[in-house]
Amino acid sequence: NITLPTPPQPVANYVNGVRAGNLIFLAGKGPKYPDGRELTGKLGGNITIDQGYEGARQTAINQLSVLKEMLGDLNKVKRIVKVLGLVNSSPNFIDQPKVVNGFSDLMVDVFGEKGKHARAAIGVNSLPRGQAVEIELVVEVYD
């Protein structure tokens, strides 16, 4: 079982999610832990693939908490449609997919077949507050 934290609040002028019809677009979230810690740094630098994977997994938990707050019940999720994973990477780091698997694997663990999604895993030079990852997603929900 996964304990969902209080959803992390936006850090700038945006909202956690927007519903358009039966789609929910969730803003990017990072690996913020319930105790307030964040996983910061660069993959291929001071962060290992395993640490990045765990950070992406925590990001998935944070996004699930946003979804639950918006929907009231995760059983209203019809499917995870699209995931965009941004990985704070050193110039030669090429294993972004292995990191973002921490997010994807949890979505499949929670939702089964309907957790399988289209995805991009992209290396970037920096992320807000030095986060190791930032991940956004699109979710289809029942009426």
Predicted regions mapped to residue ranges:
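Short, polar/acidic, helix-capping and beta-turn segments at strand->helix junctions
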Residues: 2-143
